[in-house]
Amino acid sequence: VKAWTPIEIDALSEILNLGMGTAAAALSRMTGCEILLSVPSLEFTTRNSVTTKLKQSTETRLVAVREPFDGLISGDAFLLFPEHRSLEIVRAILKETTPEDTLTEVAREALCEVGNIILNACLATLCNMLKES
């Protein structure tokens, strides 16, 4: 994994924030509610490291959405949510109550769709910026 400078990470975070804005607009249209998203943290790591971190996560149960990508750049993008936040997102999308402590199959599919919307918007914004430079 390439070592990124703080300036490069800041620039990429700004690009991803633009993608998050696009994703937030799409999710707002889906839910009929204003959705605000930001890039809380950005980390470059290997797939094995992500898997290890997910298995070792004991403080908060996490839900992950993975989006492989190929083209100008290739890799896997992971979007991680604390499980309780993922249930909030699903409730907003499905406009129904999901059990407090469980992700049903429909809820999992909805969360995957939300993750795909967010990750695709971010990756598309990144690719568009790379094509322009």
Question: Which residue stretches match the model-derived regions?
Answer:
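Composition-driven recognition of glycine/serine/threonine/acidic- and proline-rich low-complexity segments
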Residues: V1-S133
